[in-house]
Structures are given as C-alpha cells and as structure tokens.
C-alpha cells in the first residue's frame, strides 16, 4: 500500500488484512514498549473511533459480514472463509476469492534462505502494514471531506452561518490531516 493509493484500494487492502490475517496478532511499538494487537481489533477500533464506513458497498458488505462473525467467534479466532466464499451476494464471493488468492503466487526462494537473506514474516509485515493501511485510509477520507467542504465554500448561495460552520469544520479537518501526516511519516520511516 502506497501513500498515493485510492481510498478503494485501501479499503481492499484492509479487507485483505481481515480475511487473511484478522485472527492474527502482532506487536506494535508504542514508545519503548511493545503492545500486543489483534489485526481485526485494530481495524475495527480505528474505523469505529472516527465513525468511518467503507464507501465501496462491496467491501463494506465483506467488512460487515466479517464483523458479525468476529463478534460471535471472538478476538483471535479465525473467521472461516466459507462465510465469504458462500455469501448470498455473488459479487462478495468473487471479490473474496480474488482477495484470498491474490498473494498466493509469491513464495520466498530457497536461494534467499541459503544466503540468509531476511524474509519478512507475517507478524513483521502486519506490525507495519495494518497501522499504515488504516492511517492512509483515514487520510484519504479526510482529504475527501476537505475537498467537499472547499466545494461548499465556493457556493455563492451559502449563508454566513453555514460559512462559519464550514470554515470551523475545515479547520478541524486540517488539524486532523496534519496529525495523520505526522503519523504516516513515523510509520514509513
């Protein structure tokens, strides 16, 4: 996932983390301590804390199905793939198959192992990838909200009260954008 990824690509990435690794845990460094985190828990807490929902209805449906089963099964328990592969919506089935099989073509070469070249483990990849994907997604949502509000400022029929409200919200969103930008810098470095 790159900083220039679209919000839809980031939604897909977050769904991939849920479907493939939602039951897995990783350690995230906070200050000097390592904090154990569950992939699904981190994604749901981050989305819920800001009241975010996926804009792509297909990914939102997969997210809702996963969340429903996750609540029943509990944290750390793998949500069986059949909930997605046998979903009543054929588009959810197709997208799930595509996501679940997308990375299966990549296997570390035996040459790498013989030469002692470090191959990143799933846990190492999750510790960076999950927080980064969630943060980048939040950034894209904030950018879209700012753009929408800036469009409203250009409206000639906007009242003074609405104008003050829009400017106030723009200021708040820009502060969040700066916070996210700082966080992304830390995640990438």
Where are the predicted features?
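Non-catalytic protein-protein interaction segments used by genome-maintenance enzymes to assemble
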Residues: 1-82, 94-98, 102-110, 142-146
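Bacterial replisome coupling helices
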Residues: 63-189
């Amino acid at each position: 996932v790159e900083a220039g990824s679209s919000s839809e690509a980031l939604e897909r990435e977050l769904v991939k983390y849920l479907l493939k690794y939602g039951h897995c845990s990783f350690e995230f460094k906070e200050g000097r301590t390592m904090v154990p985190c569950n992939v699904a828990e981190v994604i749901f807490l981050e989305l819920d804390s800001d009241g975010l929902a996926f804009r792509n209805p297909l990914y939102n449906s997969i997210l809702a199905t996963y969340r429903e089963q996750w609540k029943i099964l509990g944290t750390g328990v793998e949500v069986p793939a059949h909930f997605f592969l046998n979903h009543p919506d054929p588009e959810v089935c197709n997208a799930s198959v595509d996501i679940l099989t997308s990375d299966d073509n990549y296997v570390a070469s035996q040459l790498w192992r013989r030469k002692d070249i470090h191959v990143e483990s799933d846990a190492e990849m999750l510790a960076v990838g999950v927080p980064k994907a969630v943060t980048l997604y939040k950034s894209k949502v904030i950018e879209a909200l700012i753009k929408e509000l800036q469009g409203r400022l250009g409206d000639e029929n906007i009242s003074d009260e609405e104008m003050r409200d829009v400017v106030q919200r723009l200021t708040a969103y820009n502060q969040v954008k700066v916070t996210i930008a700082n966080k992304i810098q830390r995640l990438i470095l």
